[in-house]
Swiss-Prot record:
Catalyzes the transformation of pimelate into pimeloyl-CoA with concomitant hydrolysis of ATP to AMP. This is 6-carboxyhexanoate--CoA ligase. It comes from Persephonella marina (strain DSM 14350 / EX-H1). It catalyses: heptanedioate + ATP + CoA = 6-carboxyhexanoyl-CoA + AMP + diphosphate. InterPro entries: BioW (IPR005499). Keywords: ATP-binding, Biotin biosynthesis, Ligase, Magnesium, Nucleotide-binding. GO terms for biological process: biotin biosynthetic process. Coiled coil: none annotated. It comes from the Bacteria. Signal peptide: none annotated. Transmembrane segments: none annotated. Belongs to the BioW family.
Amino acid sequence: MYYSIKLRASRDGKHLSGGERIVLKDKIEEAVNQLYRKAEPKDPDEINIKIESIKEKPLVIKSSLKIENIICEDYKSSNQIALEILKRSTGIPVERLKELIDLVHTGSAPDGSNMRGAMIVNQKGERIELDHFRGIRTTTVDFLDRDKILKKLVKKGYTERTVDALCLTTKNMLYPDMIAEYCISDEPDYITGYVSTKDFYYRITPLKSEGNPKGGRIYFVRNSIDLQDFYRFLQEKPVLIEDVGID
């Protein structure tokens, strides 16, 4: 049986770090320690760890999305490339895409803060997430052998952040009515972001300005999407990925 381990670290009620692993019972202690070591340097005053058995049989897929690395001179050039990819994938007019991306860079919650989850945007350019503060979060996904995948990616010059991002966005793109994704971190000093489509994870540097504490995700979906089913799949369906899409 597989177990889901979720960790959330915060300070003064503000979210600092989070992570999830899906492992067999004999790997629980090791996974908890790994998640704790990731959160501890951020000096949280509260850490919550939740461990629960996964009742539903995980969907096992062969590989993650293929990685395409893009490096530009500045974040404006990077976002121009992101716009071109998103326009091709979604059909949404560039001006509306710019407005949506600007929201992520300035705070996409109604009060101008960062959303806790992702925006959901249909092909009409409409925001359709059920809660504009909470958004939607993708959970219950991991690589079958995470340590092996991390070693492969590090050898190619990537980081553990790439493992986490690639894992989440690969699950997202499994959903038939998910078209594309845009993501930047809310950490001020982390400027690499990504755009994903059905085939590729475009890792783009820099996708935001250094020092900007805003960030978030946009999930682009078809107009015909069943929102309740989409939420259930992303938040509850267990997915395990065997390999990573690099040469």
